[in-house]
UniProtKB/Swiss-Prot annotation:
GO biological process: glutamate biosynthetic process
Coiled-coil positions: none
Keyword NADP attached: yes
Keywords, in A-Z order: NADP, Oxidoreductase
Lineage, opening ranks: Bacteria, Bacillati, Cyanobacteriota, Cyanophyceae, Synechococcales
Known partners and oligomeric status: Homohexamer.
A family per Pfam: ELFV_dehydrog_N
Active site: residue positions: K104
EC number of the protein: 1.4.1.4
Record's catalysed reaction(s): L-glutamate + NADP(+) + H2O = 2-oxoglutarate + NH4(+) + NADPH + H(+)
UniProt cross-references to SMART domains, sorted A to Z: ELFV_dehydrog
Cellular component terms (Gene Ontology): cytoplasm; cytosol
Protein name per UniProt: NADP-specific glutamate dehydrogenase
Length: 428
């Protein structure tokens, strides 16, 4: 637990352990990952030079089933980050009652600096390096930050080449033509929207009286913003890594999505070269967005966005974490003292892994579902588990994050106990 992010993540476990009758053995196991792999990936660049990229894969726990977790491409990827993300995946899968453990992977690079051919060589090289540690019954990959269905297709193809058989279930989030599931591309954002639909009315927050700010306008942030807009919520602010826009009257989300998809950034959306016509819109920074006086704040970017340093500036009444780990433990305490409800990442963004599970099931069975079937099953799953978590908050008088960890811990503890005491009887 040397890394700062992982040390912070583990504090959430410690808070929940006070409320769960878990054995000392089970508690001790959950403090450490099962396997942590570091690899070096050589890639021949388009100019003929050779570059080495560091890569990682962590399988945190497989008590409830094979590891499950995405692969991210980002300049800030470290073993500490990957281990923390695998830790969160363990609890996320248990919380949603999926037959998976938690895993995560990543490569340290800026993918925007590589050509498509270089990214393909990198993706295939990553699978070459970790092939003996993954598989449909061992550890299953998926998209994450700056990875997409195209890259998942390359990875599945490379694994199939290595194993000399078609193995679609080793990767989820693939193109539909390669065995991917309907609805997987939008699952994280759609699942978050279902959680909000179920939870906000408990506080008398409805579309007509609720303002929303979304930090992060990648796949998940874009989808949840559009879902909210279509349902009648007033989305007044959005941002990406380059900055954002604010409009007190509400933003035309479909128009922004169209621009973002054509230009890959929100920066300059209302500008022609150096001349900007913002109209009713104002340009704002990510820091300013987090401090807006809105009903709902949705962090949908990266981890550690709300910290001890800026939590006191947050004025939203409800936070729904679409990103992984956007709020630090110290910030949690400050937000709680202000009466702000934080709906945690392991619940809110679990739509992605839930539909990944659906894809894995479809790959294994050979039976494929329509988009309506996928979304109906997703909504049922998300709403059901959110209600379980909410009931725990009422019964034990704990915050929503602690309730989510309690719910997940109960399932993990049951699975560990069900496996028996084989460790006591192994030959020394």
């Amino acid at each position: 637990m040397a890394g700062s992010l992982f040390a912070d993540a583990s504090k959430r476990l410690e808070k929940a352990l006070k409320y769960v009758a878990i054995s000392d053995d089970a508690g001790e196991r959950l403090k450490y990952p099962k396997t942590s792999l570091s690899v070096s990936i050589p890639v021949r660049m388009d100019d003929g030079s050779l570059k080495i990229f560091p890569g990682y894969r962590v399988r945190y726990d497989d008590t409830r089933g094979p590891g499950k977790g995405g692969v991210r491409y980002h300049p800030n990827v470290t073993m500490d980050e990957v281990q923390s993300l695998a830790f969160w995946m363990t609890f996320k899968c248990a919380l949603l009652n999926l037959p998976f453990g938690g895993a995560k992977g990543g490569i340290t690079l800026n993918p925007k600096e590589l050509s498509r051919a270089e990214l393909e060589r990198l993706s295939r090289g990553y699978i070459e390096a970790i092939a003996d540690f993954i598989g449909p019954d061992i550890d299953i990959l998926a998209p994450d930050v700056y990875t997409n269905e195209m890259m998942m297709g390359w990875m599945m193809d490379q694994y199939s080449i290595i194993r000399r058989k078609i193995s679609p279930a080793v990767v989820t989030g693939k193109p539909v033509t390669m065995g991917g599931s309907q609805g997987r591309n939008t699952a994280t954002g759609t699942g978050a929207f279902y959680i909000m639909q179920g939870m906000l009315p408990k506080f008398d927050q409805y579309p007509e009286n609720t303002t929303v700010a979304v930090q992060g306008f990648g796949n998940a942030g874009m989808v949840v913003a559009e879902c909210l807009y279509q349902d009648g919520y007033k989305v007044v602010a959005i941002s990406d890594s380059q900055g954002g826009i604010y409009n007190e009257q509400g933003i035309d989300i479909p128009a922004v999505i169209d621009y973002k998809q054509r230009h890959r950034t929100l920066a300059g959306m209302y500008c022609d070269q150096a001349i900007c016509d913002l109209g009713e819109n104002q340009q704002i920074s990510n820091a300013e967005l987090l401090a807006l006086d809105v009903d709902v704040l949705i962090p949908a970017a990266l981890e550690n966005q709300i910290t001890r340093d800026n939590a006191d500036q947050v004025r939203a009444r409800y936070i729904f974490e679409v990103a992984n780990g956007p709020t630090t433990t110290a910030a949690d305490d400050i937000l709680a003292s202000k009466g702000i409800y934080v709906f945690p990442d392991i619940l809110v963004n679990a739509g992605g892994v839930t539909v990944s599970y659906f894809e894995w099931v479809q790959n294994r069975s050979g039976l494929y579902w329509s988009a309506k079937e996928v979304n109906d099953r997703l909504k049922e799953k998300m709403v059901e588990e959110a209600e379980h978590v909410w009931n725990i908050t009422q019964e034990l008088d704990v915050n929503v994050r602690t309730a989510a960890y309690i719910h997940a811990l109960n399932r993990l503890s049951e699975a560990m106990d069900a496996k028996g005491t084989r460790d006591y009887y192994q030959d020394s």
